Amino acid sequence: MNTISTTTRLEQLLGDQHVLKNAPASTLVEKSLLRGEGRLTDTGALTVATGAYTGRSPKDKFIVDETSVHEKIEWGQVNQAIEKETFLHLYEKVLTYLADKDELFEFRGFAGADKTYRLPLQVVNEFAWHNLFAQQLFIQPTTEELTQHTPEFTIVSAPGFKADPSVDGTRSEAFVIISFEERIVLIGGTEYAGEMKKSIFSVMNYLLPEQDVLSMHCSANVGVEGDVALFFGLSGTGKTTLSADPNRKLIGDDEHGWSERGVFNIEGGCYAKCVNLSYEKEPQIWNAIRFGSVLENVIVDEKTGLPDYNDTSLTENTRAAYSLEAIPNSVIPSVAGHPNTIIFLTADAFGVLPPISKLTPEQAMYHFLSGYTSKLAGTERGVTSPEATFSTCFGAPFLPLPAARYAEMLGEKIAQYEVQVFLVNTGWSGGPYGVGQRMKLSYTRAMVQAALQGELNTVETITDSVFGLHIPTRCPGVPDFVLQPRNTWDDKEKYDKKAQELAKQFIENFKRFTNVSEAIQKAGPSI
């Protein structure tokens, strides 16, 4: 079976079935309610439950081992190979399954706000709410663009189809399979909508570097003077929260490209964690949850329709999906100039990293390659308490190419555009997870604001004896003692022990990077 026949087979299915194509949000919401897929909250948002899968299932994600990509992909635990015949057999079974459905839902749009690099997408869904999600998260076409739209990548999502591992070559009933030659993402067995979003991110992380564009797992915003900031970090570290700043315009909250012309959003919407969400702490996100947006796995009062964002009985990984247009000060189209400031976000479960530190270019490369954070509860199946982890480039689960490819591109751009880089710890202070407290959001916001406004450029710094980080001695809006993590611990000896423990993990993890310069090697912790 070749590309033409897989495409033709899908076209036949969509031609034979009753298919709602690029339906307005109101229609998709109505369909979702009639089909029993969800219910409305008091603000008109559609709330849904995703069943057993309330987060990504990385062990069920595969890339088809095809001739054109075989030598380029970094095969391993993240990028698991699956045979072409296995994929084609499963694809045929999924289409046969979808052919029995009374109706299907199709969305056509784009990934990539910069028209030079955008990818025309087609999303075919079994569920109406999944199609609404796709409409919110990807970039919607104009009426004219839709008439001329030719998909270059297609998502086929059939959550109700459960694979049989003994027959279908999968690990479980769930699967997310990317075929770069067939230009298809095949999803089944899981209702978690984030799989659609992240699979296209993986696709763009393969395609964009081939066009000399750095793809990045980061949020981005821009100030009134046109100064651009990037926030790198894994899920739950604060990308969405910190980039939603009423004094700056939002470019995007999670996925971006950086070309010779500047940065651009890959998406057209946001997918915000909403555990413990409140209007006081995050008014922009709170107000964006309205008609047309989707709430995943949030408990809602049956009588009042009020969401309880503190209830994590289904999962810690509760989410809100909404269009960028729901953010009043978003940049549309989501393109901007070159970054002035980069902030690496980490949620340090050990509680020993400073809340903010300035990085040298060598330290920036060291920490980008290290990608240290903690896996936070709920973002992946089986994670119920934070675990220390190293995720290269702050996005290893989504990077098909070798990490060095992305790191080299970032290093070149930091040097070319003289970008200031900071490491910000949004994790624990005063002790490790379970003992200390999560860093106050108000403190983190104050530190980020000071960094973006250049207020830390002339502040005296102290060099951390273990991590070598340059810690500002003062920062507007933050008590001085908070800036030095050792000061916040009651037991200083326990702090020293924990710091050494984390430093050893950094050093052990970095041993795998054998081809980096000695200057970068020495930019990490010393024990």
UniProtKB/Swiss-Prot annotation:
One of its GO terms (biological process) is gluconeogenesis. Its EC number is 4.1.1.49. GO terms for molecular function: ATP binding; metal ion binding; phosphoenolpyruvate carboxykinase (ATP) activity. The gene is pckA. It comes from the Bacteria. Its cofactor is Mn(2+). Involved in the gluconeogenesis. Catalyzes the conversion of oxaloacetate (OAA) to phosphoenolpyruvate (PEP) through direct phosphoryl transfer between the nucleoside triphosphate and OAA. Keywords: ATP-binding, Cytoplasm, Decarboxylase, Gluconeogenesis, Lyase, Manganese, Metal-binding, Nucleotide-binding. Coiled coil: none annotated. This is Phosphoenolpyruvate carboxykinase (ATP). InterPro entries: PEP_carboxykinase_ATP, PEP_carboxykinase_C, PEP_carboxykinase_N, PEPCK_ATP_CS. It is an enzyme of class 4 (lyase). GO terms for cellular component: cytosol. Substrate binds at R56, Y192, K198, R319. ATP binds at K198, H217, G233, L234, S235, G236, T237, G238, K239, T240, T241, E282, R319, T444. It comes from Halalkalibacterium halodurans (strain ATCC BAA-125 / DSM 18197 / FERM 7344 / JCM 9153 / C-125) (Bacillus halodurans). It catalyses: oxaloacetate + ATP = phosphoenolpyruvate + ADP + CO2. The keyword Manganese applies. Pathway: Carbohydrate biosynthesis; gluconeogenesis. Binds 1 Mn(2+) ion per subunit. The lineage of its organism: Bacteria, Bacillati, Bacillota, Bacilli, Bacillales. Mn(2+) binds at K198, H217, D254.
